[in-house]
Swiss-Prot record:
Similarity annotation: Belongs to the metallo-dependent hydrolases superfamily. Adenosine and AMP deaminases family. Adenine deaminase type 2 subfamily.
Positions of Zn(2+) binding: 11, 13, 189, 270
Record's protein name: Adenine deaminase
PANTHER family on file: ADENINE DEAMINASE
Site (Important for catalytic activity): 213
Length: 324
């Protein structure tokens, strides 16, 4: 069991963290039929395209600041109960605008939930604003401008998510320059649905501190060596990768070879209930399926805190908390 281990997470999409039970309550609140996306208290999808449709349907059940406060507090409290001391959630102001709530109110609702969870459990958390790749470079640049301007104390990073196979990384370089100049931490989805080349392109054109996923770097030995030498941190999500059939099973997942090659890796849950996982389950799989020792896993957690987009006093407190 890994229940005794402190945990930290750098990669979770907040709408994708919605427990099915909460989605059902929200559906009743707004009189929405969820029979096509939730059956037997589990989300229903078959492939990446239907997963995105299901995800969007669940996200549409959150419509007010209070809804988003509830979502953030629910997820972070669940994490804290599993021994998690730090969490970064990926958030989309574009979604706040799309539903008519507005980006500012969307962020404020999430922030209220984060603060409530911290007051209740002590868990520290931050938000990473994400651009949506398949909406195109201009849309992502506008999101980057918003992130740079907003200056919310809990917004500390920027990500690029969405359909990895649309648009080249180079087309988003301007967006990342905007947020880099604003002092935000940088990470980008790459090396998940697209191959090793997408990780290399991200390193060349975006120069991020971290890569969201990045696991298909394993297809290129020189790239793996580069990741290790440059100290780029991978936000690895094994349960997600297996559910989406990026890899057939945990036995063929490259977390261990990446770790043994000296790449800095961390454990994450991505969209946990959609993939029948949780951060606690990812730690269990690492220990009992992939064979990592407690000290190996502690090292991954320490890496997550070292790579977290937080101020240095907060980082020092979190590192100290690992050994309490």
């Amino acid at each position: 069991m890994t229940a005794h281990l402190k945990k930290a997470e750098l990669h979770c999409h907040i709408e994708g963290a919605t427990p099915p039970e909460l989605a059902l309550r929200q559906a009743r609140k707004y009189s929405v039929d969820t029979s096509a996306i939730i059956r037997d208290k589990a989300y229903v999808w078959e492939d990446f395209t239907s997963f995105v449709r299901c995800y969007d349907s669940v996200a549409s059940l959150f419509r007010t600041q209070g809804d988003y406060a509830l979502l953030a507090e629910t997820y972070l409290t669940e994490l804290a109960e599993a021994g998690t001391i730090y969490s970064e959630i990926i958030v989309s102001p574009d979604h706040g605008n799309t539903i008519g709530l507005g980006a500012d109110a969307y962020l404020e609702g999430l922030a209220a939930g984060m603060e409530a969870a911290k007051a209740k459990t002590g868990i520290e958390s931050r938000m990473l604003i994400t651009g949506i790749r398949h909406l195109g470079p201009e849309s992502v640049a506008k999101t980057a401008e918003y992130a740079a301007m907003r200056r919310h104390p809990l917004v500390t990073g920027f990500n690029l998510a969405g359909e990895e196979r649309m648009h080249s990384v180079a087309e988003f370089a301007r967006a990342f320059d905007i947020v880099r100049d604003a002092g935000l931490g940088l990470t980008i989805h790459a090396g998940e649905l697209s191959g090793a080349f997408s990780v290399r392109d991200a390193l060349d054109h975006v120069r991020p501190a971290r890569i969201s996923h990045g696991v298909r770097a394993i297809e290129d030995a020189d790239l793996v060596k580069r990741l290790a030498e440059e100290g780029v941190v991978l936000e690895v999500c094994p349960g997600s990768n297996v559910s989406l059939q990026v890899f057939a099973d945990f036995a063929s997942h490259p977390l261990r070879p990446l770790y043994e090659a000296g790449v800095r890796v961390t454990l994450n849950s991505d969209d946990p209930p959609f993939f029948h996982t949780s951060l606690a389950q990812e730690y269990e799989v690492a220990a009992h399926v992939m064979g990592f020792s407690d000290s190996d896993i502690d090292r991954m957690t320490k890496t997550a805190i070292e790579a977290a987009f937080v101020d240095e006093p907060t980082r020092e407190r979190l590192l100290a908390a690992l050994h309490v």
